């Protein structure tokens, strides 16, 4: 129910904003601000997914290609997501191991896909780590996001990139994020996939063309 998905974080933002205005306790204020920020991020992702999916359905999702530094995108995404990780989860990226390369692609859309995969991993990982990296394989770049979360059954893997499919119905989200990721990567002449076993985490990966 899309309206329910939107109302849930919106109600949290409104409710905790009202409480925040009434409390003088510093620790309570800090906790309420965190809750408001978390739900604001969720609401933004929900709205972005809905708008992008609408553009996909209309055939007007835009792309703008440019020479792009993947390492810069990875640095930015680490800064964005590191402080948002669950309490017992570490975000890991070995920047020294990342090759300094430029690929001709859409930096905005590639960033969107990486951000979505990291956010998804955080949603289903209660403890352990989420690592993301890329490496050059002949003819393309392979980008990976690997987590130590709950894992995904083979049944779900076969439909996970379909629209409105959710791994866990109790988790918030539109069920459109991975559909949008697949559409973007295929439009950029790449492929996307997942490898996982229940209880053993998941590895999401995608490729982008690279000519050296």
Predicted features along the sequence, with ranges:
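Helix-loop junction within the histidine kinase core
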Residues: 54-65
